[in-house]
Amino acid sequence: MDRKEQKSIIEGLLFVSGDEGIYPEQIAKVLEIEMNEVMNILEEMQQECEGANRGLQIVQYAKVYRFATKKEHASYYQKLIDTPTAASLSQAALETLAIVAYRQPITRTEMEEIRGVKTDKALQTLVSHLLIKEMGRAEGPGRPILYGTTKEFLDTFGLKTLDDLPPLSEENEQMNEADLFFGSLQEISK
């Protein structure tokens, strides 16, 4: 196997090892090559990644090698993290979000009754995107969690307050909340 292929494989190993990284000994074992050769290849790859036209670098922490983003690009990564988008949400999550937006505070069971399917995964996604949060507990058996939208929800969808959501007219009350919400989002984003 030539040097180019070895680098390619090591690059893949670094990628799949993720944040945990990979020991050079593991690379040597996988590629069936000597440790000094692994170290030489890693050093070459580190130098190649130092160029200004590369977004990743290979770093060593506690004897483990892994990919990391470059510090000088941190402000761009932060912008991405700070702006969750509706495009990254599944259809189920968007439908659930619309229900929460119009019916908050609302329990998971109430959402499932409206949607007709389980909402566990959609709720986890919305909470992790900081678009909804726990607002307290409902009275009654089991004291279920009540969910509502967050400031991040308003920011993400360009709303100042929940009053900026399109009103549910008598005609629209028959319409699925999700359909109405998606329509309103298209209007807001124009």
From Swiss-Prot:
Q: What is its main location?
A: cytoplasm
Domain of life, per UniProt, equals Bacteria
Q: Give the InterPro entries listed for this entry.
A: ScpB_csome_segregation, WH-like_DNA-bd_sf, WH_DNA-bd_sf
Keyword Cell division among UniProt keywords:
yes
Q: Where is the signal peptide?
A: none
**One GO term of the cellular component aspect?**
cytoplasm
Where is the protein situated, by its record's location annotation?
A: Cytoplasm
Q: Does the keyword Cell division apply?
A: yes
Listed SUPFAM superfamilies: Winged helix' DNA-binding domain
- What's in the keyword line of the UniProt record? Cell cycle, Cell division, Chromosome partition, Cytoplasm
Q: Which GO terms describe its biological process?
A: cell division; chromosome separation; DNA replication
Concerning its family, UniProt says: Belongs to the ScpB family.
Give the function comment from the record.
Answer: Participates in chromosomal partition during cell division. May act via the formation of a condensin-like complex containing Smc and ScpA that pull DNA away from mid-cell into both cell halves.
Q: Which HAMAP family match?
A: ScpB
This chain belongs to the protein called Segregation and condensation protein B
- To which species is this protein native? Bacillus cereus (strain G9842)
Which gene is this protein's source?
scpB
